[in-house]
């Protein structure tokens, strides 16, 4: 059984800082992310054995569509406030600029440099509102502009094929604009005969606008606060985070909060008070999982950052019932309705444990969304489901080889209950008869 004391899960990004210390981190984490903006498939390959051996969830994060400065033709590459530049001449992008209109903002280097288009005739002229040094290769955000680029390119296709072949549990899609983007990735995964689940990264204005349709089509969403904080006013980030997480939980899908979780620990062995508070608030907003990025790729203290996240998450989890957001699931099926019955029984009977045998993991995810204080154990015959559930709040997944006989399943659950709680009331959820794809039964038992 996958042992854990905290309920909020931890996903780390693998990079130079952590790669030689992964063995020290392996018992502190639930998933590993490969950022394909920097990593290669050869790099991923080196770590697959240790991840498989420890049943760690693998997430491939596709590089996605990213606009960059292609060429700077200015003599002075330090832009000054009030200066005017011609986009496409003074500053060339790797993007067709025809869709940029007067009044649109052009944000460079994570929003540190800000231009506003003041004229569009045969040329696009922008005035510098916030200056700074610009270089070729810097990232560019166009928050007001509809980006007409394919969501997946040739490099992404090769990486998706690799992820399918190597049984990655999740593929994360960057800069998701609408449900069609999600469907495109799902179709490609199907063409490669894979079953990787799709995490949609919400990091653009268009993604925010279409968050409900994106969430319905996705297996999970990520609050990607880096680019999102460039695309929308930074003061709106807490509200957008709460909204994204609430919608994800309403639809019963995985939710991940990312970017600058412990940013100060890139260079310091201790977090700031604000970071600790941010972690707890993300948990109380309803996130399943917290993700470290630069902290574990280029940071000086990757293990320390992981340990801090563990400690803070554990304490926040203990107080979820006092301060956490109460999830309201969309009830559109029998199994969605059934989990509310689980919640009522939990409240009335003070149940200590819920055991939810599952093939796909869906019922375990739904029960997780209710944020009950009972332990949730999800036995499964499917190793992929076991690893996917590593990222789901409060769920402890384990293998159950005997999954074709109802009586054997129930007896195994009873043995688990004796081991886990010794005494007390517990629940078992089941799909009856065997092979039923929907959970439709709750057994209430006591020891």
Swiss-Prot record:
Residues that, per the record, bind ATP:
35-38, 68
Q: Name one GO biological process term.
A: glycolytic process
Spell out the reaction equation it catalyses: pyruvate + ATP = phosphoenolpyruvate + ADP + H(+)
Which annotated residues bind Mg(2+)?
203, 227
The UniProt keyword set, sorted, is:
ATP-binding, Glycolysis, Kinase, Magnesium, Metal-binding, Nucleotide-binding, Potassium, Pyruvate, Transferase
Q: Does the keyword Transferase apply?
A: yes
User: What cofactor does its activity depend on?
Assistant: Mg(2+); K(+)
Which residues take part in binding K(+)?
35, 37, 61
Pathway(s) annotated for this protein in UniProt: Carbohydrate degradation; glycolysis; pyruvate from D-glyceraldehyde 3-phosphate: step 5/5
Offer an example of a GO molecular function term for this protein.
pyruvate kinase activity
Q: Where is this site: Transition state stabilizer?
A: 201
Q: Does the keyword Kinase apply?
A: yes
Which Enzyme Commission number(s) are listed? Answer: 2.7.1.40
* Pfam entry (one): PK
- Protein family according to the UniProt entry: Belongs to the pyruvate kinase family.
Q: Which NCBIfam families match?
A: pyruv_kin
- Listed name of the protein: Pyruvate kinase
- Species per Swiss-Prot/TrEMBL record: Methanocaldococcus jannaschii (strain ATCC 43067 / DSM 2661 / JAL-1 / JCM 10045 / NBRC 100440) (Methanococcus jannaschii)
């Amino acid at each position: 059984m996958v042992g854990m004391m905290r309920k909020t899960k931890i996903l780390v990004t693998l990079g130079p800082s952590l790669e030689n210390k992964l063995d020290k981190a392996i018992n502190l984490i639930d998933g590993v992310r490969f950022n394909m903006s920097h990593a290669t498939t050869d790099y991923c390959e080196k770590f697959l054995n240790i991840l498989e051996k420890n049943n760690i969830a693998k997430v491939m994060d596709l590089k996605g569509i990213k606009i960059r400065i292609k060429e700077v033709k200015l003599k002075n590459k330090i832009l000054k406030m009030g200066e005017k530049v011609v986009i496409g001449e003074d500053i060339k992008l790797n993007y067709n600029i025809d869709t940029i209109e007067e009044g649109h903002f052009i944000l460079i280097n994570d929003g540190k440099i800000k231009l506003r288009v003041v004229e569009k005739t045969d040329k696009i002229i922008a005035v510098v509102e916030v200056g700074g040094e610009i270089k070729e290769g810097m990232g560019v955000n166009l928050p007001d502009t509809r980006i007409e680029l394919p969501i997946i390119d040739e490099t992404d296709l090769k990486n998706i094929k690799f992820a399918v072949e190597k049984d990655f549990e999740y593929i994360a899609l960057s800069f998701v604009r609408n449900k069609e983007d999600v469907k495109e990735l799902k179709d490609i995964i199907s063409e490669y005969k894979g079953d990787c689940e799709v995490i949609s990264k919400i990091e653009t204005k268009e993604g925010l606008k279409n968050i409900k349709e994106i969430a319905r089509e996705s297996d999970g969403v990520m609050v990607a606060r880096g680019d999102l904080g460039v695309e929308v006013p930074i003061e709106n980030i807490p509200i957008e985070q709460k909204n994204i997480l609430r919608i994800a939980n309403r639809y019963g899908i995985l939710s991940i909060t990312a970017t600058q979780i412990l940013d100060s620990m890139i260079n310091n062995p201790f977090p700031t008070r604000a970071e600790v508070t941010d972690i707890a608030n993300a948990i109380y907003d309803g996130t399943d999982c917290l993700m470290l990025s630069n902290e574990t790729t280029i940071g000086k203290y990757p293990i320390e950052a992981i340990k801090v996240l563990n400690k803070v998450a554990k304490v926040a989890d203990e107080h979820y019932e006092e301060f956490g957001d109460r999830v309201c699931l969309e009830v559109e099926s029998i199994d969605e309705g059934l989990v509310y019955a689980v919640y009522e029984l939990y409240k009335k009977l003070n149940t200590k444990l819920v055991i939810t045998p599952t093939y796909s993991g869906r019922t375990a995810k739904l029960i997780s969304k209710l944020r009950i204080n009972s332990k949730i154990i999800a036995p499964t015959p499917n190793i992929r489901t076991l690893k996917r559930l590593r990222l789901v709040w409060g769920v402890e997944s384990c293998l159950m080889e005997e999954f074709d006989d109802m009586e054997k399943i129930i007896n195994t659950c009873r043995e688990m209950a004796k081991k886990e709680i010794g005494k007390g009331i517990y629940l078992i959820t089941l799909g009856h008869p065997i092979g039923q794809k929907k959970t439709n039964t709750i057994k209430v038992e006591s020891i």
